[in-house]
């Protein structure tokens, strides 16, 4: 028997560890996302209908970016820049909020007494070179909008963008002027999308569009695939409210705890915009019927649970599964 390569084994273990530690999706509509070009993606992401799963190597890259923030702060302080309030928060209501990398009180050479919002990003060489050539507004519009929103939330009219090239440690530092119109429109857009009951139109109806091809929502958006996520936010009973809480109509419950939202309950009904099947509503509103192929499947507490249908819609309602459920009433479809 050939022994496993020890270095590969260790690498795999490290990557598995990071994957096991990966964070749950954020509960709010993050300011860092408001510059994303697609309304539908923002809605699906906020509704936890599409949850990106990253391999361990990518998660280690994210960690490197987070660790770089401490180094940047230390370098700025070493040259006399007074930076404070690391991870200060701004909130605009209707679920829109975010955390700043820092607030600079003074010391930026071009404006020594002026306050700045601080934003730090790491880049690949290709990304870094493009940004140096075109500037952050054109090259990284999502980062630029993020800074506009942070300026808006802190009443600071300048931002300092510090970019690091991960390949060769080059720095690109750029001062950004606050644009009130851009910021207010971005916040209003985020609030509108967060409070929308129905899924917005996509950026493009063309599945080969360059901004759609590699999107995590591509199969749901362009190939009529159902969501894979059963949680409170993908449930037809839930509503996002303007006070940044969620309400459950099925149980007449306000302010659903975030921890509970991740799993939900067995009364979950899949939001009709998140599946490709025709829906037949019930009179009491506690369940629905989905027409999947030549079968009509009940979804609700007295029928198939949402997690069963989403795990394998092709077997739900078949004679074999119905017989299995008759013999074992607690049996569930898991795949």
Put a short name on every predicted segment:
Residues 68, 142-145:
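A generic structural signal for residues located within well-ordered alpha-helices
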Residues 87, 146-148:
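Glutamine-centric residue-chemistry signal
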Residues 105-107, 164, 249-251:
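A generic structural motif
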Residues 110-117, 121, 142, 151, ...:
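Internal, hydrophobic cores of structured domains that mediate oligomerization or house catalytic pockets
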Residues 122-124, 165-166, 252:
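A short beta-strand motif that forms part of the nucleic acid-binding face
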Residues 130, 137-142, 149, 153-247, ...:
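Metal-dependent nuclease catalytic regions and adjoining charged, substrate-binding loops involved
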């Amino acid at each position: 028997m050939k022994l496993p390569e020890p270095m590969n084994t260790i690498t795999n273990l490290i990557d598995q560890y990071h994957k096991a530690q990966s964070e749950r999706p954020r509960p709010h509509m993050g300011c860092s996302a408001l510059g994303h070009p697609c309304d539908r993606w923002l809605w699906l992401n906020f509704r936890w209908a599409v949850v990106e799963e990253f391999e361990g190597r990518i998660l280690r890259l994210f960690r490197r970016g987070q660790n770089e923030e401490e180094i940047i702060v230390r370098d700025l302080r070493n040259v006399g820049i007074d930076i404070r309030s690391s991870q200060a928060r701004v909130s605009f209501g209707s679920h829109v909020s975010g955390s700043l990398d820092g607030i600079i009180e003074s010391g930026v050479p071009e404006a020594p007494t002026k306050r700045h919002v601080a934003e730090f990003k790491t880049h690949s060489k290709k990304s870094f070179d493009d940004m140096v050539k075109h500037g952050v507004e054109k090259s990284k519009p999502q980062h630029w909008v993020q800074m506009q929103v942070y300026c808006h939330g802190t009443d600071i009219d300048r931002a300092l963008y510090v970019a690091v090239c991960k390949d060769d440690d080059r720095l690109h530092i750029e001062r950004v002027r606050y644009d009130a119109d851009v910021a207010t429109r971005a916040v209003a857009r985020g609030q509108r999308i967060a409070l929308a009951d129905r899924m917005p139109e996509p950026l493009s109806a063309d599945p080969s569009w360059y901004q759609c091809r590699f999107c995590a929502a591509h199969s749901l958006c362009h190939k009529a695939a159902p969501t894979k996520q059963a949680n409170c936010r993908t449930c037809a009973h839930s509503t996002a409210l303007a006070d940044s809480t969620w309400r459950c109509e099925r149980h007449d419950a306000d302010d659903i705890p975030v921890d509970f939202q991740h799993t939900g309950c067995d009364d979950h009904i899949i939001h009709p915009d998140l599946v490709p099947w025709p829906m037949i509503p019930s009179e009491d509103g506690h369940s629905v019927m989905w027409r999947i192929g030549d079968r009509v499947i009940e979804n609700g507490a007295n029928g198939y649970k949402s997690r069963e249908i989403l795990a394998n819609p092709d077997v739900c309602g078949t004679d074999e599964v119905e017989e299995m459920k008759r013999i074992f009433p607690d049996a569930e479809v898991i795949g």
